[in-house]
């Protein structure tokens, strides 16, 4: 949204909105701005969630491989039996197999194809902390 649009919604002037945004950026509350692109527009028809459990001694190499494969669009290091949970965007099942083959020599994987995302990426509530 433009500063003018934000000002109208918030009931503030555009310069006031601009100043508040600048202060939030300086404090690190706002870390940046992004564009929301639909991966399907670039041929990425499938998304998968991959649980990854590195083989003994392979943790660092698995992490390097995940970072090196750009189709992995998100990855979290987690507690539990698996070490990583990652999101992957691919154009086909064949591409999925090819990419997973690079990981499967270093780790056990469990893959689920995403059918639908009822909750899109969103922020948690921003209100005051409840006791």
Summary of predicted features, one role per range:
Residues 1-131:
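A compositional/biophysical signature of low hydrophobicity enriched in polar/charged and small residues
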């Amino acid at each position: 949204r433009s500063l003018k649009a934000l000002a109208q919604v918030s009931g503030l002037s555009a310069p006031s909105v601009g100043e508040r945004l600048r202060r939030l950026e300086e404090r690190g509350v706002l870390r940046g701005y992004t564009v929301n692109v639909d991966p399907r527009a670039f041929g990425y028809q499938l998304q998968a969630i991959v649980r990854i459990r590195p083989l003994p001694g392979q943790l660092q190499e698995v992490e390097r491989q995940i970072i090196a494969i750009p189709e992995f669009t998100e990855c979290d290091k987690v507690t539990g039996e698996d070490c990583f949970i990652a999101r992957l965007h691919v154009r086909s099942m064949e591409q999925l197999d090819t990419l997973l083959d690079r990981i499967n020599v270093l780790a056990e994987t469990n893959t689920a194809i995403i059918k639908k995302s009822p909750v899109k990426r969103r922020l948690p509530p921003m209100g005051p902390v409840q006791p």
